[in-house]
Amino acid sequence: MQNIKVLIVDDSAFIRKMLRDLLEIDSSIQVVAAVKNGKEAIEYIQSNPVDVITLDVEMPVMDGIETLKEIMRVKPTPVVMLSSLTKEGAEMTFKALDLGAVNFLAKPTNIFKISSSTDIQDNIIDKVKEASHLFNIYFYFKSDMIEEIK
């Protein structure tokens, strides 16, 4: 079985590093790149294969919602949104789910809690694996439906 190739998109270098470290605990996940904004993410996916994207909701240059729209337009890919636990962040996360994101995570805020909690680590890993699997099922059935229509 091939590794799940993950692109991390977050304006915080700290969060990018933390997510990389957490995801790479699982040998079936390979973080292929970590970029700081949506513009860099779009450029990356146009020339590099990615199975799952973790995407921050609030970023400069191109926010998570605009980035998600562009991802779904140019190269539909399963996206797990990361959001802070603010009201605005929650609203944007629900909008992202409507636009095609497959899941969301509350953005980790306490590195000491994260590094000592296997529940949080497992949750992040599980959501990335689920995103990859669910998206593959979606496209499998979508292609079958298109064939039936023809």
Residue ranges and their predicted role:
Residues 1-150:
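Strand-loop microenvironment adjacent to phosphate/nucleotide-handling motifs in alpha/beta enzyme folds
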